[in-house]
């Protein structure tokens, strides 16, 4: 027997979906929250649960929020199937509010047989410290099952369009800047949840052998400091990592380099123009010519921000890439090669090392010395 569904709809109209799931990070007048859900069961016996939609208002009483409506319904279902394990997936226009987030964490802590994956179109009050802490509490895994939260990318929007929209068999047409907004929100969520890189990803991509092969991605780790009483103070909430977006991934037809993704997110930090900041980047490859030009423009226009770049390897250090690095240095950026100290710092700060110390690879120091000499020659405009 199924419990009765209340306050649900089967599908939404196309304009309703496009309006409410539009993923620009800062939006007004989107006060209705749409929650599309799917419930799957583990094991050979799978009760036929239908995917449906809850909706509610942002500023209404908590019990009318779609997240709470879902759990009210789901709790009734659980009473009929206490021994079953469930995988619940949400696709939601706004991430849950602080109170909903805390109640969700309590529910999941009390029912370890339920796992919840949340795909969000936008982040609600992502700048609020209390909200950030609530999200971390919901998504942390150390003390037992919790939720997994991700930003909706093209694939999730396409899935919702096919599953929850009266699409009349028309294909999903992404709006302008969908992939760019996805990257911005992905980076901001990573900052909030303090995502860490897995050790193999770090050691593979940051290996500093000068002529290494098969490293086609650029990883960029970053941290931000603010000057206070003549001392640089680390801003823990402004720390994270990202990588370039390959062509045809997450809706990027032409791809987007890590440095440009990083520049996209800085305006959302809302750095105080009357304060001095130092941004430090640790990159697996040095910037290409175009990215170096854009980074130079940024620091030229933002005099309150200084930029330090430590790179593991030099990308195509012939021709225009050399010119780009010189332009970036002339604009005021400090460019250096990563040494053991920087590799260890990245390992300790950005990697989920599980308490294991950083183990340098063979040739690390020799490669750093060689690359440092080549970088000096490039910046001094000397022939190799």
Curated annotation (Swiss-Prot):
Residues 209-336 are annotated as: Necessary for homooligomerization. Changing residue 67 to A: No effect on cytidine deaminase and antiviral activity. (Microbial infection) Antiviral activity is neutralized by the HIV-1 virion infectivity factor (Vif), that prevents its incorporation into progeny virions by both inhibiting its translation and/or by inducing its ubiquitination and subsequent degradation by the 26S proteasome. Can also be neutralized by simian immunodeficiency virus sooty mangabey monkey virus (SIV-sm) and chimpanzee immunodeficiency virus (SIV-cpz) Vif. Its cofactor is Zn(2+). It catalyses: a 2'-deoxycytidine in single-stranded DNA + H2O + H(+) = a 2'-deoxyuridine in single-stranded DNA + NH4(+). It is found in: Cytoplasm; Nucleus; Cytoplasm, P-body. Homodimer. Homooligomer. Can bind RNA to form ribonucleoprotein complexes of high-molecular-mass (HMM) or low-molecular-mass (LMM). HMM is inactive and heterogeneous in protein composition because of binding nonselectively to cellular RNAs, which in turn are associated with variety of cellular proteins. The LMM form which is enzymatically active has few or no RNAs associated. Its ability to form homooligomer is distinct from its ability to assemble into HMM. Interacts with APOBEC3B, APOBEC3F, MOV10, AGO2, EIF4E, EIF4ENIF1, DCP2 and DDX6 in an RNA-dependent manner. This is DNA dC->dU-editing enzyme APOBEC-3G. The lineage of its organism: Eukaryota, Metazoa, Chordata, Craniata, Vertebrata. The gene is APOBEC3G.
